Each structure stands twice: as structure tokens, then as C-alpha cells.
């Protein structure tokens, strides 16, 4: 059903600055964008832009109502999943009990058909399904990102979150264990995508059951990417990657250099 993660969406109070950051840091190319009418994604309306780097994409959204947004941060907003046939997928997901924010998909400026889930049926977090146009976008010369491996979420109950993905998206638990932040984590694969679920050391401190936490970008070789990233002003939390509970090598960016948003490079096991 889900073929890949098309993009992570971010809220920003300054769209031009956010575009410039991706251009400078990841050699990204602006693929399109424009004004957005008030709607489910941004109730106040605003404007957006899509940036591409390697085989990855990000959607940047600048709302009219910027209450609670920091001028220094990218705030994770949603994840978009690619499906082959959006109408067939809507029928299948509706049969599983999911609801959507509109009766039918809309078409964005890039020609993508997309439809948001009603977040009341997705643990309060925003997700949408996307059908790409027949003419696939070519990868650009940005940072050599192969794909987005997962979106990460902080959750109040790891067991309940795992069960939700297994039951609703026919997921399978890949593995997990103690997290470096002092809690526990788990990786769940569903279709051809993955999610990382992180239960903090003090789950009661969370206000919501699910909160978007980070994105993981797959690269062919982390050490060779470090120098490329550092030449663009990015820094990392360590000199070398660590290996997580499912055999992935992971290295996080310092959030001081990634506009306050948590991102990491990932080298998948052979």
C-alpha cells in the first residue's frame, strides 16, 4: 500500500529563510509552491514550497497565523506517504476504519494527488496519502539522500503504539530496545515504509499520545557525507555514527545547525 515516504512537512514563520536553509545546507532545489487557501493542513491559510535534495523532498509551510511558532525553528507538521492508486487506497483504508479530512483528493502545484487523514483516526498526528504523476521527478545534485527511511514519533505507550501500527497498517515489529535518550524505542515496518516509535523515560511528561520527533535520511556512506555536510555549515552530535537496535548506523545533526529540527543520516545494514 505505502510505497515510500514522499516528504516530511514543516511549519516555518519565514518561508524564504527556510528555503534558503535547505538550499545552503543540502544543496536543495525549489520544485514549486505558492499561496494556500485556508484548509485542513493550514486553517489560517498561507503559502508553501517544495524543496528537493537527492531523492528526498520537504514541504515547507508558512501559515498566516504564526501563534506558537519560533523564528529559529522548523516545526514538524506532517508526513506524506506515496500510494500507487489513491482512490483504491482510500477505499481500503476506509474499510479499516480510517477517516479523511475531505471527500476526495486535491491536486497540488506539483501535480500530486493528495488526501489528508482525519487526525482523530491517526493518533492526533497529520499524515496524507499521495499519488504521484506519471512523469517521475528526477533526483537532483543535492546531498546524496537515497530516500527517507522513517518519521520518528515520541509516544506515551510504546506497546500501544506498536499495536496500533500492527493492527491498522498491517505492520510488523522489526526490533528496538533502550533509546539513547533514556527511554525505549521500536521500529515497525508497514508496506515499504517504516516508523520509529520512542517512549521517553517519563511518558507522563507528554501532553499528547503521539508527537513528531525526527526524520531519518538514508545515505550510502555516512563518513563520506559528514565532510560534505560540514562544508555546508552542518554539525553532528558525534564524530562517528552509532548502531541502533535494528542494525542501522545513525548520526544525528546538531539541532543548532538544523534549524532546531531533529534529523539524522542513516546507513542501512547490508
Locate predicted features.
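A structural feature that tracks compact, well-ordered secondary-structure segments
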Residues: 59-63, 80, 84, 92, ...
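An N-terminus-focused feature that recognizes amino-terminal "leader" regions
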Residues: 2-9, 16, 20-49, 58-62
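N-terminal beta-strand motif that seeds the catalytic metal site of vicinal oxygen chelate
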Residues: 1-19, 76-83, 130-162, 212-217, ...
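Short glycine/proline-centered loop/turn elements that form peptide/ligand docking sites
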Residues: 17, 35-38, 160, 177-184
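Short strand-coil-strand connectors
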Residues: 52-54, 182, 189-191, 256
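Amphipathic alpha-helical segments
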Residues: 14-30, 87-97, 157-173, 223-233
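Tandem-repeat architecture and repeat-register "anchor" residues
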Residues: 8, 29, 33, 79-82, ...
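Vicinal oxygen chelate
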Residues: 90-144, 177, 186-187, 227-270
Amino acid at each position: 500500500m505505502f510505497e515510500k515516504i514522499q516528504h516530511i512537512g514543516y511549519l516555518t514563520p519565514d518561508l524564504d529563510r527556510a528555503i534558503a536553509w535547505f538550499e545552503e545546507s543540502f544543496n536543495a532545489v525549489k520544485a514549486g509552491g505558492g499561496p494556500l487557501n485556508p484548509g485542513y493542513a493550514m486553517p489560517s491559510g498561507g503559502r508553501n514550497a517544495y524543496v528537493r535534495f537527492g531523492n528526498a523532498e520537504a514541504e515547507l509551510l508558512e501559515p498566516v497565523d504564526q501563534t506558537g511558532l519560533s523564528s529559529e525553528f522548523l516545526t514538524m507538521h506532517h508526513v506524506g506517504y506515496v500510494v500507487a492508486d489513491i482512490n483504491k487506497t482510500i477505499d481500503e483504508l476506509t474499510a479499516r476504519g480510517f477517516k479523511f479530512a475531505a471527500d476526495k483528493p486535491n491536486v497540488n502545484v506539483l501535480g500530486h494527488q493528495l488526501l489528508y487523514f482525519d487526525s482523530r483516526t491517526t493518533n492526533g498526528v497529520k499524515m496524507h496519502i499521495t499519488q504521484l504523476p506519471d512523469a517521475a521527478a528526477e533526483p537532483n545534485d543535492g546531498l546524496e539522500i537515497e530516500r527517507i527511511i522513517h518519521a520518528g514519533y515520541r509516544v506515551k505507550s510504546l506497546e500501544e503504539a506498536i499495536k496500533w501500527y500492527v493492527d491498522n497498517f498491517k505492520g510488523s515489529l522489526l526490533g528496538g530496545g533502550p533509546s539513547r535518550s533514556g527511554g525505549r524505542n521500536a521500529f515497525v515496518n508497514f508496506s515499504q515504509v517504516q516508523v520509529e516509535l520512542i517512549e521517553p523515560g517519563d511518558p507522563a511528561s507528554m501532553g499528547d499520545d503521539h508527537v513528531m520527533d525526527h526524520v531519518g535520511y538514508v545515505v550510502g556512506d555516512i563518513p563520506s557525507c559528514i565532510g560534505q555536510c560540514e562544508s555546508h555549515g552542518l554539525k553532528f552530535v558525534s564524530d562517528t555514527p552509532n548502531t541502533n537496535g535494528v542494525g542501522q548506523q545513525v548520526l544525528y545533526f546538531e539541532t543548532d545547525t538544523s534549524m532546531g529540527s531533529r534529523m539524522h543520516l542513516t546507513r542501512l545494514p547490508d
